[in-house]
Every structure is written in structure tokens, then in C-alpha cells.
């Protein structure tokens, strides 16, 4: 590959980061976005929060109950939820759940290890 910023990432070579006892993740970051694999055990709760990134959450396995801007939304396997920049949201795993998340701009707080 050329030296034009092209980079191949292999998920199996990226360390799994334990966020809590119930949530873990792996992520890669480009210039403008972060791509994350997130694993949530059934019953896991990510408290209400907001961030400077637009978020797309694609549920590959399991299901999530999300409270987004006061609205209760269930996101199931095969579904994608878009959360605009700055919108408060909370997550609860209804099952053992595996999601792919895309964030833009990048999650600098994750890189700096200062945010969930």
C-alpha cells in the first residue's frame, strides 16, 4: 500500500479494552471518524451522556434499549440507529450484544482514555 494514509487494521490484533465489568470495546481511528466494536453483557447500562460526535450504532447481535433525547428506542439485530451530535443518550443491553459503532468526528476522549 502507498504511504497516502492507507492502513489495514486487523480486529484480532487490536487489544480488547475493558470499559466496565459489563462493557468492552476495540476501536480504530482515522482522520475524521472512529470505528468501534462494542461488546455489552446482558443488563449492561451505559449512563446518560452526550458527545461531540455523530454516532451510528449497528447491532450485529443482540438488542439494545436506548433512551435518546427522552425517547425510548429498541434497536435489534440488523438495525442501525443514528444519534446526532450532542444528543443525550443512555444504553441498556437487553441481551448479550455486539455492535459496530461509527463516530464522527473522532472520539478523542477514547484515545485520551478520558471518556466512556
Question: In which residue ranges do the predicted regions lie?
Answer:
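A short, N-terminal "cap"/entry segment at the start of jelly-roll beta-barrel domains
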Residues: 1-32, 36, 115-116
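Conserved short histidine dyad/triad with adjacent acidic residue
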Residues: 21, 36-50
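Structural motif
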Residues: 34, 56, 63-65, 72, ...
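Short, conserved beta-strand element in jelly-roll/cupin
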Residues: 39-41, 51-66
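A cytosolic small-molecule/anion-sensing beta-strand core signal
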Residues: 60-61, 76-77, 95
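Short acidic-glycine-tyrosine-enriched beta hairpin
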Residues: 70-85
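Ligand-binding loop in jelly-roll beta-barrel domains
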Residues: 85-109
Amino acid at each position: 500500500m502507498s504511504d497516502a494514509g492507507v492502513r489495514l487494521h486487523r480486529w484480532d490484533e487490536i487489544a480488547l479494552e475493558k470499559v466496565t465489568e459489563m462493557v468492552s470495546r476495540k476501536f480504530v481511528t482515522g482522520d475524521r471518524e472512529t470505528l468501534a466494536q462494542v461488546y455489552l453483557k446482558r443488563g449492561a447500562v451505559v449512563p446518560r451522556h452526550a458527545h461531540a460526535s455523530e454516532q451510528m450504532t449497528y447491532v450485529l447481535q443482540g438488542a439494545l434499549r436506548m433512551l435518546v433525547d427522552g425517547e425510548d428506542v429498541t434497536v435489534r439485530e440488523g438495525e442501525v440507529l443514528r444519534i446526532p451530535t450532542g444528543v443525550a443518550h443512555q444504553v441498556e443491553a437487553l441481551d448479550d450484544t455486539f455492535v459496530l459503532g461509527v463516530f464522527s468526528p473522532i472520539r478523542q476522549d477514547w484515545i485520551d482514555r478520558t471518556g466512556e
